[in-house]
Curated annotation (Swiss-Prot):
Keyword Heme: no
Chain positions covered by the region annotation Disordered: 83-110
GO BP: cotranslational protein targeting to membrane; protein transport
GO cellular component: nascent polypeptide-associated complex; nucleus
Domain NAC-A/B: 16-80
Protein name: Nascent polypeptide-associated complex subunit alpha
Xref: SUPFAM superfamilies: UBA-like (SSF46934)
InterPro entries to which the protein is assigned, alphabetical: EGD2/NACA0like, NAC-like_UBA, NAC_A/B_dom_sf, Nas_poly-pep-assoc_cplx_dom, UBA-like_sf
Pfam families with a match to the protein in the record: NAC, UBA_HYPK
Subunit structure: Part of the nascent polypeptide-associated complex (NAC), consisting of EGD2 and EGD1. NAC associates with ribosomes via EGD1.
Localisation per UniProt entry: Cytoplasm; Nucleus
Function: Component of the nascent polypeptide-associated complex (NAC), a dynamic component of the ribosomal exit tunnel, protecting the emerging polypeptides from interaction with other cytoplasmic proteins to ensure appropriate nascent protein targeting. The NAC complex also promotes mitochondrial protein import by enhancing productive ribosome interactions with the outer mitochondrial membrane and blocks the inappropriate interaction of ribosomes translating non-secretory nascent polypeptides with translocation sites in the membrane of the endoplasmic reticulum.
Length: 176
């Protein structure tokens, strides 16, 4: 079939020569094709996301995956900036309306204030727990390791160790 015979607007996938060779090699490796996957995303530092729509996914016996498809770069920072700009435009459009419909304020400033308020209450609760902690019967090295591994207060580490009868692994798993 030549290019002239393909109808206008038809959805045609052209497979590059290298990809075709790779697919043939995969068939020789006895990888299983996984059906039903509609999208694969890979996240990288800095909110950079690579998305593959309608991928061909293969799984090896060892549990590794091979993904074929066209990767598109999706910058989450740009999406967030666009969403904030749209929300700011919407807020400006509704600036003339001062009456409330019983809804909470969803502006970025209100959300930030709510988050700060919530984090302050958590800090107050943590400070209340921080008082003198009875470490008798527990190894100080165990407590230090749990604090180092889970980044929690010494009081929480002691509490978790006591709950699990001195079992460091279960205490770390609970706090992680």
């Amino acid at each position: 079939m030549s290019i002239e015979e393909i109808p206008q607007g038809a959805d045609v996938n052209v497979i590059p020569k290298n990809e075709k060779k790779a697919r043939e090699l995969i068939k020789k490796l006895n990888l299983k094709q996984i059906k039903g996957i509609t999208r694969v995303t890979f996240k990288q530092r800095g909110n950079l996301i690579y998305a593959i729509d309608a991928p061909d996914v293969y799984r090896s016996a060892a549990g590794t995956y091979v993904v074929f498809g066209e990767a598109k770069v999706d910058d989450m920072n740009q999406r967030i900036a666009d969403a904030q700009a749209a929300q700011a435009a919407e807020t400006d459009a509704h600036a003339g309306h001062t009456h409330s419909h019983g809804e909470e304020d969803k502006s970025p400033e209100a959300i930030t204030a709510d988050l700060e308020k919530a984090s302050l209450t958590e800090k107050i609760e943590e400070e209340e727990e921080e008082g003198e902690v009875d470490e008798s019967g527990l190894d100080a090295k165990d407590i230090d390791i749990i604090v180092e591994q889970t980044q929690v207060s010494r009081a929480k580490a002691v509490k978790a160790l006591r709950k699990h009868d001195g079992d460091m692994v279960n205490a770390i798993m609970e706090l992680s």
